[in-house]
Curated annotation (Swiss-Prot):
Record-given protein name: Fluoride-specific ion channel FluC 1
Binding locations of Na(+): G70, T73
Primary role: Fluoride-specific ion channel. Important for reducing fluoride concentration in the cell, thus reducing its toxicity.
PANTHER family, A to Z: FLUORIDE EXPORT PROTEIN 1-RELATED
Modulation of this protein's activity: Na(+) is not transported, but it plays an essential structural role and its presence is essential for fluoride channel function.
Domain of life: Bacteria
HAMAP family: FluC
Catalytic activity field: fluoride(in) = fluoride(out)
A Pfam family this chain is assigned to: CRCB
Swiss-Prot/TrEMBL GO biological process terms: cellular detoxification of fluoride
Species per Swiss-Prot/TrEMBL record: Carboxydothermus hydrogenoformans (strain ATCC BAA-161 / DSM 6008 / Z-2901)
Key words, A-Z: Cell membrane, Ion channel, Ion transport, Membrane, Metal-binding, Sodium, Transmembrane, Transmembrane helix, Transport
Parts of the chain that traverse the membrane: 1-21, 34-54, 59-79, 99-119
Length: 123
């Protein structure tokens, strides 16, 4: 039961932060590329990589890894925006968005792991 509470607490905070950042970025950026979701997923990938690299205890992992970053990042929105770009006839912009998001997510996850290892003295 405690596990579910930790995940729920972290997830709700992550989802609220994602919503807030999406609104703030949307107020400043009016382009046709899904910048908010892209940035949020990059930040989330980095943070999750950092958390993973520190190999913290299960309680922190459930609160932050599964909960917070699970609520903060969003695969469903990523797919929705890709489909939307396709429906708008923006094929190459869609391909760019999909590939850039995947590549950048992997790079930022690895960067987070590297930074965690650096701080632990393992690099």
């Amino acid at each position: 039961m405690v596990d579910l509470l930790l995940i729920g607490l972290g997830g709700s905070i992550g989802a609220i932060l994602r919503y807030t950042l999406t609104k703030k970025i949307g107020e400043r950026y009016q382009g046709d590329w899904p910048l908010a979701t892209f940035l949020i997923n990059i930040i989330g990938s980095f943070g999750l990589g950092l958390l993973y690299g520190f190999k913290l205890n299960q309680v922190i992992w459930l609160l932050l890894g599964t909960g917070f970053f699970g609520g903060f990042t969003t695969f469903s929105t990523y797919i929705y925006e890709a489909i939307f770009l396709m429906e708008e006839g923006l094929f190459w912009k869609n391909v760019n968005y999909l590939l850039t998001s995947i590549f950048t997510g992997v790079v930022f996850f690895a960067a987070g792991m590297w930074l965690a290892n650096f701080f632990k003295g393992g690099v």
